[in-house]
């Protein structure tokens, strides 16, 4: 009898915990939906400053300084979630192949590689594999997810880093195109971004 009472109490407590968890999940919008609201077309992009490790610009790169010279494309990669991301490599390769088309439109492309501070430089070097990025591309590091968190793009799940994202900013820093991928795929192609310019 005592075992039956304990089992009933356990079942009731489990149901209560499950109900609370389900109601909290129902009330909390998905992180991607939050990011889509914060990064909606017409919004002004938050300024940031990140270290360049390759490409046209060097040193600390500040978005507002780059944006003062024209339109900017911001591409957020996944970084190193335990291995180098083949979809990120393909996307960067696509932008490299189309670099002259972005230059012809007086548009800078900032590729952001997020990750924990430890080993981020090493992982970025592995990702680039000695590739020299042509102008107008610049490869930036986001140590400790400072940028990623500020933009609401942190993919906080095991072996994940950031939601792959592409933003196109006009000369005033307003978002005129945004694509946030909820999976590893569904990235913006260079052609899609060039069309948005």
Range-by-range predicted roles:
Residues 22-26:
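Boundary at the C-terminal end of the N-terminal hydrophobic targeting segment
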Residues 134-137, 154-167:
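Structural micro-motif
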Residues 161-197:
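Thiol-/selenol-based redox modules, centered on thioredoxin-like
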Residues 63-95:
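Short active-site neighborhood of thiol/selenol oxidoreductases, capturing the structured segment around
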């Amino acid at each position: 009898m005592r075992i039956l009472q304990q089992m009933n109490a356990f079942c009731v407590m489990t149901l209560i915990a499950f109900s609370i968890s389900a109601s909290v999940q129902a009330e909390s919008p998905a992180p991607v939906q939050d990011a889509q609201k914060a990064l909606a077309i017409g919004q002004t992009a938050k300024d940031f400053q990140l270290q360049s490790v390759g490409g046209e610009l060097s040193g600390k790169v500040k978005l507002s300084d780059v944006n003062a010279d024209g339109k900017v494309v911001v591409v957020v990669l996944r970084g190193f979630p335990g291995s180098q991301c083949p979809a990120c490599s393909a996307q960067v390769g696509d932008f490299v192949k189309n670099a002259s088309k972005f230059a012809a439109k007086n548009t800078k492309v900032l590729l952001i590689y997020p990750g924990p501070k430890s080993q981020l430089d090493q992982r970025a070097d592995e990702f680039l594999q000695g590739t020299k990025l042509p102008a107008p591309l610049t490869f930036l590091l986001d140590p400790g997810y400072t940028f990623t968190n500020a933009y609401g793009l942190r993919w906080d799940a095991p072996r994940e880093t950031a939601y792959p994202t592409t933003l196109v900013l006009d000369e005033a820093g307003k978002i005129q195109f945004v694509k946030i991928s909820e999976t590893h795929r569904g990235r913006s192609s260079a052609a899609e971004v060039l069309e948005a310019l």
